[in-house]
């Protein structure tokens, strides 16, 4: 299957009308049934809104049915709309979340950001009350050697060790470098062997089904190695992103095996209109 990049998933961002529709989701959607986990939202798709009004955006996400969110670091994602988060103290940010009755235990951090100042990233995470620090990619070469993969894993194990000292779980998303091949083997699978299972957990991007990476297969193959997942609907017939429950994915199987994989939280990550349309299905899904 041909690769579908993250940028392609979000290039058709919702219009203001779609935003309005997204924000009008009813209060009856505030409960989630899959594994007893709250319905989560990655804030990347609403980064423009966050840049303009973070407190208002969080309240609106809560009204739409999301009970927990995943942020992006104000340093590593400063150019993407998250720089403004840096103006809040941890107490202020926690109050904004608390007032909206929304929790946040996870955030994305750029690998280069952590290379330059991991201590600063950890300090911000602790101040905000996070327990998970996720890196989207180790940013290795697109045609890596086995040594490239080993070096990347060694470096990230050390970062995981530093995070663990602070009581934070380091995590790794699967994008770009993680989806390459090395000597006929998937780099992603090699990383499961090279990364310390205690120091680094994995966050699965469900949309990588478009590249042949099946979430349920990985949760079963590597029990206990995951901590979270990014949820996107995907139609094999149209090869397009769809609302969860309006696609061809077996979500009952995905969530059932997610328990085996160790999933502690999940975050819907699509354009606003599709995120809104996914909430009722997730609320009613029984596994």
What do the predicted segments below correspond to?
Residues 41, 71, 107, 135, ...:
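Conserved beta-strand positions
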Residues 54, 83-86, 90, 142-149, ...:
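Flexible, glycine- and charge-enriched loops at secondary-structure boundaries
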Residues 77-81, 141-145, 237-241:
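A short acidic, helix-capping loop that chelates divalent metal ions and anchors anionic groups
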Residues 44, 74, 112, 138, ...:
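Flexible loop residues that form catalytic
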């Amino acid at each position: 299957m041909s690769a579908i990049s993250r940028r392609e998933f979000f290039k058709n961002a919702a219009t203001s009308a779609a935003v309005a529709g997204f924000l009008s989701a009813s209060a009856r959607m505030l409960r989630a049934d899959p594994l007893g986990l709250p319905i989560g939202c990655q804030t990347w798709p609403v980064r423009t809104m966050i840049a303009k009004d973070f407190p208002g955006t969080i309240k609106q996400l809560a009204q739409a049915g999301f009970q927990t969110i995943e942020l992006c670091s104000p340093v590593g994602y400063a150019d993407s709309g998250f720089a403004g988060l840096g103006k809040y103290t941890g107490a202020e940010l926690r109050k904004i979340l608390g007032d909206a009755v929304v929790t946040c235990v996870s955030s994305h951090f750029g690998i280069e950001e952590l290379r330059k100042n991991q201590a600063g990233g950890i300090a911000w995470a602790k101040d905000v009350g996070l327990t998970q620090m996720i890196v989207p990619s180790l940013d290795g070469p697109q045609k890596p050697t086995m040594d490239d993969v080993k070096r990347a894993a060694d470096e990230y194990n050390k970062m995981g060790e530093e995070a663990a000292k602070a009581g934070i779980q380091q995590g790794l998303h699967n994008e770009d470098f993680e989806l390459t091949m090395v000597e006929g083997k998937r780099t992603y699978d090699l990383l499961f062997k090279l990364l310390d299972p205690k120091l680094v957990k994995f966050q699965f991007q469900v949309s990588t089904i478009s590249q042949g990476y099946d979430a349920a297969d990985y949760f079963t193959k590597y029990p206990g190695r995951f901590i979270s997942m990014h949820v996107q609907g995907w139609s094999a017939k149209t090869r397009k992103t769809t609302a969860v429950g309006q696609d061809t994915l077996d979500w009952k199987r995905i969530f059932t095996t997610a328990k085996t994989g160790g999933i502690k939280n999940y975050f819907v990550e699509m354009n606003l209109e599709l995120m809104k349309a996914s909430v009722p299905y997730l609320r009613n899904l029984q596994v």
